[in-house]
Amino acid sequence: MADISTVQMAVTEIARYAGRMIELIESLPEDQLWSTGCGIPNSIGTLSRHLTGNLNHYFGAGILKNGYVRERDKEFTETGLSKAQVLSDLRDAVNVAKAAVEAIDEAQIDKPYRSPCGQEYESLAYHIVKLATHLALHVGQADYATRCV
């Protein structure tokens, strides 16, 4: 049985992994943000855009009901944004995730949860832990990709 501390720990991990993604982006020259290599089809810029959209969609639209509308296809096709913009957007998305956790009604944590795209989860806590692992996966890809660009 999960409680608010489980959710808070998951969001702490989200912030930690997002911090690692920010470090990776900051370490790249501007012209390498959108480069691919090592057989990874997505650039670090694209991975960051995807994570930004994911956090805004599930925490912003899903939990906060803030009206965010995800354009998932653009996360993979919209390239050429500046490094500063990509970093700013990712930082803002992490803040949305943190705000969402603060807004969660503790009584909802162990109840079944339907995501904004209609997927059913056994609980809101499980869904948030899943979001943390999704972020970790893509940050790992980005970490690997920095060695190839």
Q: What is the predicted function of each stretch?
A:
Residues 11-15, 22, 30-74, 115-149:
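Short, contiguous alpha-helical
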Residues 14, 18, 25, 90, ...:
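Hydrophobic alpha-helical core bundles mediating ligand binding, dimerization, or RNAP-core interactions
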Residues 1-9, 53-103, 107-119, 148-149:
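Short, helix-capping/interhelical loops that line the mouth of catalytic, cofactor-
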Residues 29-33, 106-109:
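Short, flexible helix-adjacent loops and helix caps
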